Amino acid sequence: MLIDQFGRKINYLRISVTQRCNFRCLYCMPKIPFDYQPKENLLSFEELFLFVKAAMDEGIEKIRITGGEPLLRKDLSIFIKMISDYKSDIDLAITTNGFLLKDFAKDLKNAGLKRLNISLDTLDHKKAKTLAQKDVLDSVLSGIDEALNLDLKVKLNTVALKNLNDDELISLLEFAKSKKAQIRFIEFMENTHAYGKLQGLKRDEIIQILSQKYQIQLIKKDEKAPVSIYKADDYEFGIIDPHSHEFCDSCNRIRLSAEGLLIPCLYFDEALSIKEAVRKGDIKAAVEILQEVLRNKPEKNKWSVVDNETSSRAFYQTGG
């Protein structure tokens, strides 16, 4: 079991397998990323798996594969199969923008993937092009349908933004309901490349908009995550509300970047590298680094909108 210095059980590992993305979403990535790592700096899937296997043995129970856009990493399904073959009951998921999902969903399911989160911020082609900086909506919708047709469990992630998609929240909820998928509205989280450029909606503002048509009722608050589950009449949806609800006291996660940085907190600059250890095959050293990262995990994150504080590390480097 992995326990940090504040008594929190750490059982959730988020792995960014690539910094690259085929979108340039306004809230995440600059038009021309300046800090992509060369391929030789990235851990191979075999090297990543050496650490992941040890982390599961130590107590990791949940793994999420992120990016950048994880489907841009060649042979991702092989990595998924490595993990699911080693521990078939691991809670294993992917977060994707869905653009390439129609082509890869079947391989991912065959490799052992059971669920995924797909970003969907708008149902309007013009807005989608504005947000992603390219024409993406038809491909994303096709990816959603393909995943659902394969009986993969799908959740839709929507970043709620003022003057961009605030007039679509009801239609997005109804779209998700029609697909029998849960939608989660996400409060915009300020980060290095988007600070001051966008304004997000807070939880109460999201509820106020949805209440124009539906009776909204809180039914579940997960203290292990920044998500609250609500009902709009008979449909359940989520709101991820890091602005409105601080969940640091029960944080259960750490992050691993594609180049091997083990990161204790999304909004914390300090990180330790496992690259040298795994490339030497030194699992004991990698586990010692894991334990040190837990000792370094802060009680609270450094995120402060008031003081204009965010981590200097961009979200596409750590998986958000």
Swiss-Prot record:
GTP binds at R14, R64, T95, K155, R253, I254, R255. Signal peptide: none annotated. Residues 5-225 form the Radical SAM core domain. GO terms for molecular function: 4 iron, 4 sulfur cluster binding; cyclic pyranopterin monophosphate synthase activity; GTP 3',8'-cyclase activity; GTP binding; metal ion binding; S-adenosyl-L-methionine binding. Pathway: Cofactor biosynthesis; molybdopterin biosynthesis. [4Fe-4S] cluster 2 binds at C248, C251, C265. Keywords: 4Fe-4S, GTP-binding, Iron, Iron-sulfur, Lyase, Metal-binding, Molybdenum cofactor biosynthesis, Nucleotide-binding, S-adenosyl-L-methionine. Its cofactor is [4Fe-4S] cluster. [4Fe-4S] cluster 1 binds at C21, C25, C28. It catalyses: GTP + AH2 + S-adenosyl-L-methionine = (8S)-3',8-cyclo-7,8-dihydroguanosine 5'-triphosphate + 5'-deoxyadenosine + L-methionine + A + H(+). InterPro entries: Aldolase_TIM (IPR013785), Elp3/MiaA/NifB-like_rSAM (IPR006638), MoaA (IPR013483), MoaA_NifB_PqqE_Fe-S-bd_CS (IPR000385), MoaA_twitch (IPR010505), MoCo_biosynth_MoaA/MoaC (IPR050105), rSAM (IPR007197). One of its GO terms (biological process) is Mo-molybdopterin cofactor biosynthetic process. Binds 2 [4Fe-4S] clusters. Binds 1 [4Fe-4S] cluster coordinated with 3 cysteines and an exchangeable S-adenosyl-L-methionine and 1 [4Fe-4S] cluster coordinated with 3 cysteines and the GTP-derived substrate. S-adenosyl-L-methionine binds at Y27, G68, S119, M189. It is an enzyme of class 4 (lyase). PROSITE patterns: MOAA_NIFB_PQQE, RADICAL_SAM. Belongs to the radical SAM superfamily. MoaA family. Catalyzes the cyclization of GTP to (8S)-3',8-cyclo-7,8-dihydroguanosine 5'-triphosphate. NCBIfam families: moaA. Monomer and homodimer. PANTHER family: MOLYBDENUM COFACTOR BIOSYNTHESIS PROTEIN 1, MOLYBDOPTERIN COFACTOR SYNTHESIS PROTEIN A. This is GTP 3',8-cyclase.
